[in-house]
Amino acid sequence: VSELRENSQLVWLHDDLPDSRVGLERRALEDVETARKILHSQGYYDGTVRHHINWEAQPPEASITLRPGERYVMGPTKLRYERTGPAGEPVDKDLPESVRGIDFMENAPDTLEAFGLAKGSPAEAQTVLNAVTSVVTAMRKAGYPLAEQGKARYVIDRSTHTLEADVLIKTGPLLRMGPVLIKEENVRPADNPDAPGAPAVNEDYLNKLSPWIEGQYWNDDLLKEYRTTLQETGLFSAIDMKPARLSPEQAKAAGWTDRSLAEAG
């Protein structure tokens, strides 16, 4: 009810009466549609919404009546994975296990229960979407920085009052953390300190600040940590960091330095 009040045309425009009956009827019908969406988002797929306008009152009074019905719960969920990139090289076995990281696909869950969507829990739309987002987030911390959601199929079973989910995840390639790539633009020549542009960045210094060990499985959290570290140096007005899709040879041809993984400037 509170969510409907917050989004109700009748409530928001209470002191701004429409010029005609048609206008008030339109507002009421818009609120009916809003109420249906709210019921569905909370798992009440059989809920009904009706409106009534008392034209005898002055000014006319409109009311919305909601009958939620039985709340649906989660039925079976299924996670499927489509490899959309090369398998990638295995992690360096010489690295200590404590720093190798994780290959998500070695023990990839096949349901959404591992991501907070238990069978029998309320079938709330936002909870379902959060669970799917959590899969992608987890993959980006475990070797798959380009993972993304593919097609998803949600089925309402009215006989059992359950919601079933079948979600496809596109994995992208399995990647490891590499050295840091710095791409500088409008850099002032070292032999001309009076020239326009920014001063050159010490690549070795920035590479030493990276929190990962080269060769471990990709982890987005480490990239975020590195971004924070770079911001704290005060050397950059803005920082853009992303997984490099180029081989070292391609990176050099594109003008990147030998030490590459992130773009900063």
Residue ranges and their predicted role:
Residues 1-6, 11-265:
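Periplasmic polypeptide-binding modules associated with outer-membrane biogenesis and secretion
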